[in-house]
A protein has these predicted regions:
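Solvent-exposed alpha-helices and their adjacent loops that cap or buttress functional pockets
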Residues: 4, 26, 54-58, 78-82, ...
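Accessory alpha-helical/coil subdomains and C-terminal extensions
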Residues: 33, 88-91, 96-100, 105-108, ...
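N-terminal phosphate-binding or glycine-rich loops at protein starts, especially the Walker A/P-loop
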Residues: 1-41
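Short, ordered loop/turn segments at secondary-structure junctions
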Residues: 8-11, 36-41, 68-69, 91-93, ...
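Short glycine/serine/threonine-rich phosphate/pyrophosphate-binding segments
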Residues: 12-22, 43-44, 71-76, 91-99, ...
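Acidic/polar active-site rim loop that often engages polyanionic ligands
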Residues: 114-127, 149-151
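Glycine-rich oxoanion-binding loops at beta->alpha junctions
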Residues: 42-96, 118, 126-139
Length: 187
C-alpha cells in the first residue's frame, strides 16, 4: 500500500513524533510512506518524498514543513491517485481542506484527518499539541511570577488564543498559578 502524510496550518508540539509513529506503523506493515512538503501547497504541486524512519526525529516543528495554503481539489485529486491513505495533520482551518478532499467523488484515497492545534478550537476533538502548550505556558507563567515577585514588578503576558482563550485559562489553572487577572479581547 502507498501512504501519504502532510501537515497543514500552524506548528504545534508533537507533530514530528506523530509523523514518525505513523511512518513506523505503516512501514511495519510493509507499506510505502510518502511525505508531502509544505502541506496542501505541496499536495497541490505534487511535492513529495519517500520517507525512511531513520530520517525522522521528534524535535520541534514539522519535518515536512507546513503552510497555510488550502487544497486545490482539482490538482490534488490527480496527485493522490495511487495513494491508499492520506494522513492530514491539520489545524482548524486547514482541516476544511482535508474535508473538501475527502468529500470529492473523484477521490478513492482514504483521507484521515488528525487534529493538531494549541488553541483547542476544534469542538468535539482532542487535539495534538494542546496539553504540551498548556504545560509550556504554565512553566513560563511560573517564571514570570518569580520575576515579578523578585523585582516587585507587575508582569503582563500576551498569549494567543484565537477567540476561545482556552490556552491561557488552562495554563493559568495548570499549576495553581498566581495569576490575578486574565484580560481577554471581546469577540
Amino acid at each position: 500500500m502507498n501512504i501519504g502524510i502532510l501537515t497543514a496550518g500552524g506548528v504545534c508540539p508533537g507533530v514530528n513524533t506523530l509523523i514518525r509513529s505513523i511512518t513506523l506503523r505503516e512501514k511495519s506493515q510493509g507499506n510505502r510512506v510518502h511525505g508531502f512538503a509544505d502541506g496542501f501547497r505541496g499536495l497541490n504541486q505534487n511535492v513529495k518524498t519517500y520517507f525512511d524512519q531513520e530520517h525522522i526525529d521528534d524535535g520541534p516543528g514539522s519535518i515536512l514543513k507546513t503552510s497555510y495554503d488550502f487544497v486545490n481539489v482539482d490538482e490534488a485529486v490527480n496527485n493522490i491517485t495511487g495513494l491508499d491513505r492520506l494522513y492530514c495533520i491539520c489545524g482548524n482551518e486547514s482541516m476544511k481542506s482535508a474535508r473538501d478532499l475527502a468529500l470529492d467523488d473523484r477521490v478513492d484515497t482514504n483521507i484521515i484527518g488528525i487534529a493538531k492545534t494549541v488553541f483547542n478550537d476544534m469542538p468535539g476533538l482532542e487535539s495534538l499539541g494542546f496539553q504540551t502548550a498548556i504545560q509550556e505556558l504554565a512553566r513560563y507563567i511560573d517564571c514570570a511570577y518569580i520575576e515579578a515577585v523578585s523585582t516587585n514588578s507587575i508582569v503582563f503576558l500576551e498569549v494567543p488564543g484565537r477567540g476561545n482563550n482556552e490556552l491561557v485559562v488552562h495554563a493559568g489553572l495548570a499549576r495553581n498559578s498566581k495569576i490575578t487577572n486574565v484580560i481577554t479581547p471581546s469577540t
